[in-house]
Curated annotation (Swiss-Prot):
The protein, known as: 3-ketoacyl-CoA synthase 2
Free-text tissue specificity from the UniProt record: Expressed in siliques, flowers and stems. In young seedlings, expressed in the central cylinder of primary roots, in emerging lateral roots and in their root cap, but not in aboveground tissues such as hypocotyls, cotyledons and leaves. Expressed in sepals in mature flowers and in the chalaza and micropyle region of developing seeds shortly prior to or just after the detachment from the funiculus. Expressed in roots, flowers, cauline leaves and siliques.
Keywords: Acyltransferase, Membrane, Transferase, Transmembrane, Transmembrane helix
EC number: 2.3.1.199
Family: Belongs to the thiolase-like superfamily. Chalcone/stilbene synthases family.
Keyword Signal: no
Coiled-coil positions: none
Amino acid sequence: MNENHIQSDHMNNTIHVTNKKLPNFLLSVRLKYVKLGYHYLISNAVYILILPVGLLAATSSSFSLTDLTLLYNHLLKFHFLSSTLFAALLIFLTTLYFTTRPRRIFLLDFACYKPDSSLICTRETFMDRSQRVGIFTEDNLAFQQKILERSGLGQKTYFPEALLRVPPNPCMSEARKEAETVMFGAIDAVLEKTGVNPKDIGILVVNCSLFNPTPSLSAMIVNKYKLRGNVLSYNLGGMGCSAGLISIDLAKQLLQVQPNSYALVVSTENITLNWYLGNDRSMLLSNCIFRMGGAAVLLSNRSSDRCRSKYQLIHTVRTHKGSDDNAFNCVYQREDNDDNKQIGVSLSKNLMAIAGEALKTNITTLGPLVLPMSEQLLFFATLVARKVFNVKKIKPYIPDFKLAFEHFCIHAGGRAVLDEIEKNLDLSEWHMEPSRMTLNRFGNTSSSSLWYELAYSEAKGRIKRGDRTWQIAFGSGFKCNSAVWRALRTIDPSKEKKKKTNPWIDEIHEFPVPVPRTSPVTSSSESR
């Protein structure tokens, strides 16, 4: 199965359907202006409602002090009981609100691990190591090269040391070494940036889909940083590329019931023991696009931390399609059919369609939480017209999420996925730039890719106070998850450069770079 062709065929079918009938541009222009006016009307509805109150206040200004005193005495005389009851009710409701409201979750800072330059894996290096293992057939080597050339990956992604060696040495000790290098590197950086003492961390959530040793990765961190004995430690495995946001959501839920706490979230993936050494094409795509990386995020529910935090967590939305057999099996770790029974992750033909359904469900849930009222009314009106009144001539209205968010961090799972989301959400190249550049510079780093993308936006100086960022990722299960953040301050790239913990900061002037549709592998015999 040629996954690249599958994605291309899927995209071609989509383009064919979309271009089957040219749109009526006159109607499109009219709708555009109606929509814009509607947006301004709803957005300014508060001011329209306040206007009568202002007029009443202006009228009351003509009252004399004696008139106001008489009015007050009158109300006091005849409505003392009702006023007392109202005041008591107000105090009760205020107390109830402050005692039951959700705790605010702040992101103090985060750090992404940047491997040493000795671990850089060019496209030529990847093909050279794949050829040297002597397992892949010539056809499958050509298949991997074709995937790699169209993947959108650049020449500076990273591979673990064990797989760059000749011959490679994928073993448990090397896998542990990779995990420790990535996790500890990211954690050291975030602790240095925030100045938080490891003993103050009360919650630890680690996610890594394919590498789950005993003791666990979370236990490694507890041991390394000597975290306190009552730390709430969680290790999430097998949850795919969307597990990073699942970890954020879990930490959020725990912080609601653990007052004055810090939560450390660590997201990574392990390549050493998960390089597929077989000839099942459905499993070879993962070899070509997954690369080394990880991130550490420090959250807090302490009100005093707001002034030094970067972001506030506004929403998390989780979607799970696992009840459907096709969705459950579309990303599946199994043994291949060869005699050696090599283990790999198989990607099915309908992966893109299933991802699209999960994405649709997730954004449909998220939309009412974040979209302006004008967008919600337009969406609801077209939905009623189509479903209730059966007016099929009206096209489904796609809300403009650019009105809800300034920045988009879309999981860098592959070029075809990014192309589809860009088209379906009508995003610009500027909005897609963090995701595309992350895929180019670091490859698919699984659940941590969202943080490399946010770090890119910070290094570019794009994050301003009040900006809203949408992180969205999808992965095995099949799951699609979202997180919405609001910037609490403007991020100054010069300060990030002084800390030297942003993986982009020393080379951000080189980006964005052009990413051609095909990047030929110039040689398959490179040695290092």
